């Protein structure tokens, strides 16, 4: 087990206090907001002829990367594609009914995973040395990376 420094302990305590405060004071989503996110949400089949700014993409990434993963392993890797040239490289991997949708999208997110995610566990899960659990265990790495990036 890794011993946390005083600064790390303070950071953990501050993060926990911040979460508890947020949880205790957060507004409950109303029905329309819940329906927008979950109940009525569908795959999009068309787009506005409008650019998606790099700032918007960064904001989406910053939110997405905080999603929960087992042991904070965070194996997902994101590539955001805006250029027509890069989208063309995706074309042969797409199902025929998705080609027009992807080619006309202002930005495409490609999500993959890093099988060497355990190289970052000292930073992502600092309170316990779990990297050895993953080292040399390709079946566990594959399963963990897949489940925690999709």
Where are these regions (language model features)?
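Acidic, surface-exposed loops and disordered segments
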Residues: 1-150
